Amino acid sequence: MDLVLRDVRVVDGTGGASYRADVGVTAGRISGIRREAGGARLSGARVLDAAGLALAPGFIDMHAHSDLALLRDPDHSAKAAQGVTLEVIGQDGLSYAPVDDATLAQVRQAITGWNGDGSGIDFDWRTVGEYLDRLDHGFDGRGIAVNAAYLIPQGTVRMYAVGWDDRPATDAELAHMKRLVAESMEQGAVGLSSGLTYTPGMYANDSELTELCRVVAGYDGYYCPHHRSYGAGALQAYEEMVTLTQRAGCALHLAHATMNFGVNKGRAPELLALLDTALDAGADISLDTYPYTPGCTTLVAMLPSWASEGGPDAILERLRDESAAET
């Protein structure tokens, strides 16, 4: 064996109890597991004393914003050091593909607070396929440090096809968005994300989202929404997501699903009951969450939706105009 991890605590992901063992690796693959007191110890060209350490399958980060970080840091130690081996990026409806030149400039400006401005990255892609090829190339041609799966950002798609206007998409604009989603799925995306408290994605109505989810379902993908409300309207926002994906026949993964605002204290069982009812009816639903009450967003998300119409430049102009304040 090339490597033996001696006396490591194995947490194998099956749900069973952990156990101590020697674990052998040959040519990058596990080639032997010898439990404690299970006979002779494994031997190999290199032996590491792993007593007191844990060994587990790589973790999947279902909600990551490493869209540019993967291209900046060849080691990606912020995630790799935590045991993450797969990240799902393209989250919250805003990322960097599919785009044209104008859309790329706008989305870079819009989410600088999430990912930085991307200085030092050449942004030589426009389609999802080209972006995934860029990830394969990675940092200086060496690939990226972890695996990545990409969600099509619905807000970026709407920015591309409709712009920043707070209105329903026209038939031609909807057809354009559906075509972009289909092409992106064919190029390797795994689903569609939304950020329905962020502009311009929030301007999409249920009918528009349902049509896009139908396209995603045709490729066996899933819809991952940051839904419309985390406050008093949270449960209704979850109901909207469940209903429209059932209508579209699309799998649903609820992003950072919480009831952690004060107004929702004690209401988590209502959310679970909603999801259980949908699951019993045959829906394909999963979620990710976190065990603490704070959250993180951008200051622009605190603005009323009317103040965000038109994009970043229009927002800045309104902020400079005292007469534009809501009374």
Question: Language-model features: where?
Answer:
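Polyanionic/metal-chelating signatures
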Residues: 99-121, 129-132, 155-159, 163-167, ...
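Active-site microenvironment of metallo-dependent hydrolases
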Residues: 1-21, 26, 304-327
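Divalent metal-coordination and catalytic microenvironments
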Residues: 8, 28, 52, 63, ...
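Di-metal (Zn2+ and/or Mg2+/Mn2+) metal-binding site signature of metallo-dependent hydrolases
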Residues: 54-78
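Divalent-metal coordination cores built from histidine and acidic residues
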Residues: 72-190, 283-285
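Functional cores that coordinate and move charged inorganic groups
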Residues: 169, 178-308
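Histidine-rich, glycine-flanked metal-binding segment
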Residues: 1-2, 10-58, 73
